[in-house]
Amino acid sequence: MEKWNKNIRFILLTGVLILSSSTFGRTSKCDFIVDSLCYEILSEEDHTVGVSYDYYGNYIPELKYRCPTRELVIPDTVVFNGTKYAVTEISSHGFEDLFSIPSVKLPNTLKKINDNGLCQAFSSDELFLPPSVEYLGMFALINRNLKKVNLEHVKYFGNNALSYTSLTEAFIRKNVEYGTAVFFKCSKLEKAVIEEGITKLPMYTFRICENLSKVELPSSLTDIGNFAFDGCAFDSITLPQNVTILRRGLFSENHRLKNIVLPEKVDSIEYWVFLNCYALESILFPANVRYINEKAIHFFKEPDDPTPQIKDIYCEGTTPPKEGCYVEGVTLHVPKGCKEIYATTDNWAKYGENIVDDIDLSGIHNSQVISNDSDAPAYDLQGRKVAHPKQGEIYIQGGRKVMR
């Protein structure tokens, strides 16, 4: 049953992308043809057009299933019936699947690349976007070869706009609109920086970015969407203090995640947040947490899966969070004097004799004072490992806040 659920999950989540890509029409409108390119008049008043290539032979039968083999140069302007039009858009599906084009030179008049406009359209690993381009539609630049593209002028990124590219860094900018799954399955992505001032990160933004090992989150961030970091590769992360909900699948399938620092304000932890986080050794749920889904921490336990490393769960709440998650073989640490209430509440009761009431909440900032000779690795409050902890400083150690 677990394996079936795992497969269904993959189908449901990836199906969103597949269906979205295939259910829209692949034919662009063509009002006139010049030099084997089709043009759609957008505005007679402004004299603007969108451009596409008739790969399916709807308007130019001799081009059916034939791809250009030289650099594609799209002009700034084109003349038809004595009127000069500015080329301001790549039409939806305009140059989709023209794999044989070595490179594309875009017009300086271009403002928009519409849905699927340059999806798998060229073999080059680099694309220059004119400064005038401010809009990338859904699936606009999907291309496994693409390693470098200038995006600083873009104000709108549609769903999956840069999915499946080979970019190595991502910079999420404030005052820019991002759809879902913009960097979905960018397998070469190693670093992501979300600019200060951003409050929301859409769902699936970095889903299955399997080499994403460094993430910088701003203090302004308050809402992170479902599965935003599913399948990533960082070993530690500190969430901003104003994040209150850990949404579905947020860190699922991150097999390297060992340490995470949760904000004091977190009050709800949803389904599969830590699904198959095999490297996670321990976790501390702050006192403010009111709800933890029963499968917030969950492992499928298929024959070829790694052995989960988690040994300890720490709950600072004197009132057990509703529902609660049970992980076999794990010790549940609760505040002193709270063993009985956890032992008789929801899924927490399943821990039985593995409930230990050893959390002392009387220390400064709810931290515990430990000796300097502790063997457990220490992390600062930003989730970075500290080789030589300083006396009097607060760290995360063994899943707990501690003071040296």
Residue map of PLM features:
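C-terminal tail/sorting-segment detector
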Residues: 394-404
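Bacterial N-terminal signal peptides
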Residues: 11-20
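Structural signature of tandem-repeat unit edges
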Residues: 46, 67-89, 99-112, 122-135, ...
